[in-house]
């Protein structure tokens, strides 16, 4: 006699056992019978579409191998019997209920799910496109403002109005970046902010293309800069809140810099292609409109919400579903998904503990002030070394050397082509770890010599101008391999993972304001100083040599203070590979009482001990007392412990001070034996 079948939504388990090989076929048959009985056209009917097979967990049999079928268009669920040999998990596991809710939430979702590869590729592509916006604008506007059609339409603007037209986009980006750094948008959805930024960018691009006078052009370029800076800042927050294990952060930064170079070359040749048409200055600028449409579509349909933001909003179920979709194609049982969720949850707790009720990024100003000053110095020297002057005003410089309007634009295009080809050939070396101090020092020396040579071009014959453009290409290449990405790479080299995003946000403000200042005064200085102008960036390069010799930190030469793998949950620690292996093994079920937190170290050494992968004995001695550093200040050691029980679903962790008597027994119980098991605190990476 056939056992009764439970077709209700209560999902009560059946008592009859069934072989695992027949589970799927039987589930399909039961689902088809249910569909035929309901006679509802809204339900998915077999065999036209197979229902999703999923792993179901009820309140009694956690992590069982029960399988069922669920229609996307209804809540009807078919539950199959449980085998008596199925391994069971303790009811006290706090991850179990969240896992069950996440699986059900994902299966009942009617949204189309993309594969993990598509989602990761879309995210990386979006980051690269946003990072190339500035380079594209440099290429488009540098040649555009010197075309005859632009000069006639805007009544031959002088050096000061020309500087305003070129530089105002950087001013808008600075104001948007400063607004993001203010912390006002911290509670806002990352995805919505990205969508708003791309819409502002598109609006600015349209106003710029349809400009009727200089004021409309300035307004359009200002809005373009606001959208650019807004998107750039939100991408920084997004990529550091949700780093992908398939690509290292250092590699992603290098790829962003390369994409900016390619976009610059693309913008230059767009100008060359349309310069003979009527209203030739409008067609190249319309490239911004096309790119804005692409970014809008990607932000709406391919970019997911930041799981860290979801965890901040206590939406742990949605965060787990999102992590599973990105990393394991929706498979919640993979260790990578579970460990990534736990690591992000730990980071959110750490950051909330550091921020408390104060300004969101206040703690970095107190604890990393010396590093921040160093990074700001890098940005100042990078922008004043002459790179922005050549990128924005290369056609203007060549015209002052005696070349005509047409030849100056084509020589700039040749310059950009050589620049891009050499950079692409150098990409494999850029992505590898290098001796940063030696590299930056040699680059400063070469740039100083090149700029000093270019300053004497007024005495050269006019026929040698083409060779001067080659010197520009050599200068730009030298700058790229030495100074272009160092200000950003140093951030991930010197700072712990939790502080990298806010520090980069702060440094990006100075990046935009320095860029605005240089692009504003360059045409004025070129007009008034002539050949003496090149002595200014030459002097800046000479100061860079002294800066590198005296101030450049030595920590990045041999080993990094923070691990990309630690931030993504990857314990492989293989830094020789550019791309990490997505299939690398992950430690299972880490003991959260093993994570120790040293709050707010006042020096690089203390922060290294607090945040890097070190042994617990370096922070907490065996006698249980708080250790004193060489600086004489006692460290506050905290523990992240697990709160079990169904009443705490979604909130598994809490902070406890080491001296709290309520957890003394728990800490002693979690102390590893002399044998040292797999999850012993001595083998775990601290936050």
Curated annotation (Swiss-Prot):
Q: How does it sit in the membrane?
A: Multi-pass membrane protein
What GO CC terms are in its UniProt record? Answer: fungal-type vacuole membrane; membrane
Q: Which example biological process does GO assign this protein?
A: carbohydrate transport
Keyword tRNA processing assigned to the entry: answer is no
Print the keywords alphabetically: Membrane, Phosphoprotein, Transmembrane, Transmembrane helix, Transport
Where does the record place it? Membrane
Under the heading Pfam families, the entry gives:
Sugar_tr
Q: Which residues carry this modification: Phosphoserine?
A: 90
| Region of interest (Disordered), ranges | 1-22, 561-587, 654-687
The UniProt record lists the keyword Phosphoprotein: yes
An MF annotation (GO) of this entry: transmembrane transporter activity
Organism's domain of life?
Eukaryota
- List compositional bias (Polar residues) regions by residue number: 7-22, 660-673
The record's family statement is: Belongs to the major facilitator superfamily. Sugar transporter (TC 2.A.1.1) family.
What is the protein name for this chain?
Putative metabolite transport protein YDL199C
């Amino acid at each position: 006699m056939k056992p009764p079948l439970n077709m209700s939504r209560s999902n009560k388990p059946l008592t009859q056992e069934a072989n695992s090989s027949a589970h799927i076929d039987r589930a399909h048959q039961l689902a088809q019978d249910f569909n035929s009985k309901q006679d509802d056209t809204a339900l998915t009917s077999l065999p036209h579409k197979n229902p999703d097979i999923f792993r179901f967990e009820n309140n009694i049999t956690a992590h069982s191998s029960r399988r069922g079928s669920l229609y996307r268009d209804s809540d009807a669920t078919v539950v199959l019997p449980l085998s008596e040999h199925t391994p069971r998990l303790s009811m006290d596991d706090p991850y179990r209920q969240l896992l069950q809710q996440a699986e059900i939430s994902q299966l009942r979702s009617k949204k189309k799910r993309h594969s993990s590869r598509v989602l990761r590729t879309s995210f990386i592509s979006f980051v690269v496109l946003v990072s190339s916006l500035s380079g594209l604008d440099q290429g488009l506007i540098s040649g555009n403002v010197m075309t005859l059609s632009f000069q006639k339409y805007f009544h031959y603007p002088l050096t000061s109005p020309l500087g305003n037209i070129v530089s105002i986009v950087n001013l808008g980006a600075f104001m948007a970046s400063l607004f993001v750094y203010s912390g006002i948008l911290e509670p806002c959805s990352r995805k919505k902010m990205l969508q708003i930024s791309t819409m502002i960018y598109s609006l600015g691009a349209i106003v710029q293309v349809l400009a009727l006078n200089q004021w409309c052009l300035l307004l359009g370029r200002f809005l373009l800069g606001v959208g650019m800076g807004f998107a750039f800042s939100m991408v920084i927050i997004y990529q550091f809140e949700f780093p992908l294990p398939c690509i290292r952060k250092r590699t992603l930064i290098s790829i962003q810099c390369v994409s900016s170079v390619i976009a610059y070359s693309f913008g230059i040749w767009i100008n060359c292609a349309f310069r003979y048409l009527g209203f030739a200055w409008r067609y190249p600028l319309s490239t911004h409109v096309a790119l804005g449409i692409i970014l809008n579509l990607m932000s709406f349909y391919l970019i997911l919400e930041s799981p860290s933001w979801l965890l901040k909003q206590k939406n742990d179920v949605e965060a787990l579903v999102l992590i599973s979709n990105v990393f394991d194609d929706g498979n919640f049982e993979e260790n990578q998904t579970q460990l990534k969720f736990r690591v992000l949850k730990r980071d959110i707790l750490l950051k909330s503990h550091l921020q408390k009720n104060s300004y969101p990024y206040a703690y970095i100003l107190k604890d990393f002030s010396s590093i921040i000053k160093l990074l700001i110095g890098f940005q100042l020297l990078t922008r004043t070394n002459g790179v922005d002057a050549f990128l924005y005003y290369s056609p203007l410089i060549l015209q002052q050397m005696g070349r005509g309007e047409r030849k100056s634009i084509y020589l700039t295009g040749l310059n950009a082509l050589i620049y891009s080809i050499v950079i692409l050939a150098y990409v494999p070396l850029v992505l590898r770890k290098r001796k940063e101090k030696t590299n930056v020092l040699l680059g400063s020396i070469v740039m100083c010599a090149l700029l000093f040579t270019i300053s004497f071009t007024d005495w050269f014959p006019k026929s040698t101008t083409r060779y001067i453009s080659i010197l520009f290409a050599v200068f730009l290449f030298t700058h790229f391999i030495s100074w272009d990405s160092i200000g950003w790479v140093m951030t991930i080299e010197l700072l712990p993972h939790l502080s990298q995003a806010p520090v980069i946000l702060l440094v990006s403000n100075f990046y935009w304001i320095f860029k605005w200042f240089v692009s504003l005064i360059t045409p004025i200085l070129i007009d008034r100083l002539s050949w003496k102008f090149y002595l200014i960036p030459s002097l800046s390069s000479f100061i860079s040599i002294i800066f590198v010799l005296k101030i450049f930190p030595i920590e990045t030469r041999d080993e990094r203070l923070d691990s990309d793998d630690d931030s993504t949950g990857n314990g492989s620690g293989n830094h020789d590979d550019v791309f990490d292996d997505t299939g690398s093994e992950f430690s299972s079920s880490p003991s959260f009482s093993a994570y120790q937190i040293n709050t707010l170290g006042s020096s690089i050494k203390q922060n290294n001990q607090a945040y890097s992968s070190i042994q617990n004995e370096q922070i907490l001695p065996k006698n249980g007392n708080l250790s004193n550093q060489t600086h004489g200040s006692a460290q506050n050691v905290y523990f992240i412990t697990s709160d079990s029980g169904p009443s705490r679903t979604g909130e598994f962790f809490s902070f406890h001070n080491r001296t709290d008597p309520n957890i003394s027994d728990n800490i002693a119980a979690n102390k590893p034996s002399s044998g040292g098991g797999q999850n012993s605190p001595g083998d775990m990476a601290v936050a």
